[in-house]
């Protein structure tokens, strides 16, 4: 039996638990901001650093595919998908695909925000949860 899905699921459970823990440990006041999503901000930045580090090691075959699936797809995927976004963008830039990288960054942020707004609107107006 192929355990790839189990490795990803186990890593995802660990990453999600870590995300929850970090989010609970962070204060809501940050610098000059009265209310700032510091937990989410922190996991996104930490995740980007870790996936950059691990992504480089993966290209050098420092660890096997199963560990990569467990840690990168599972743990970091559960911790933050923003780290994958950062790695994908870096890979485009490294290949001098600047238009693609800019389109990816702008498109992800703009369409992501639009998606959140539409989802919010639909839940508020059609599901009856105000």
From Swiss-Prot:
Transmembrane ranges?
3-23, 38-58, 67-87, 102-122
Q: What Gene Ontology molecular function terms does this protein carry?
A: fluoride channel activity; metal ion binding
Q: How is its activity regulated?
A: Na(+) is not transported, but it plays an essential structural role and its presence is essential for fluoride channel function.
Which Pfam family, just one, is annotated for this protein?
CRCB
Q: What does the entry list as the binding residues for Na(+)?
A: 77, 80
Question: Which topology term describes how it sits in the membrane?
Answer: Multi-pass membrane protein
Localization, UniProt: Cell inner membrane
Q: Which InterPro entries match?
A: FluC
Q: Which reaction does it catalyse?
A: fluoride(in) = fluoride(out)
Would you indicate the residue range of the signal peptide?
Answer: none
Question: Keywords of this protein's UniProt record, alphabetized?
Answer: Cell inner membrane, Cell membrane, Ion channel, Ion transport, Membrane, Metal-binding, Sodium, Transmembrane, Transmembrane helix, Transport
One Gene Ontology cellular component term attached to this UniProt record is: plasma membrane
Q: Principal place where this protein is found?
A: membrane
Name any Gene Ontology BP term: cellular detoxification of fluoride
Q: NCBIfam families, alphabetically?
A: crcB (TIGR00494)
As for family, the record states: Belongs to the fluoride channel Fluc/FEX (TC 1.A.43) family.
Sum up the protein's function in the record's words: Fluoride-specific ion channel. Important for reducing fluoride concentration in the cell, thus reducing its toxicity.
Write down what this protein is called.
Fluoride-specific ion channel FluC
Q: From what organism does this protein derive? A: Helicobacter pylori (strain G27)
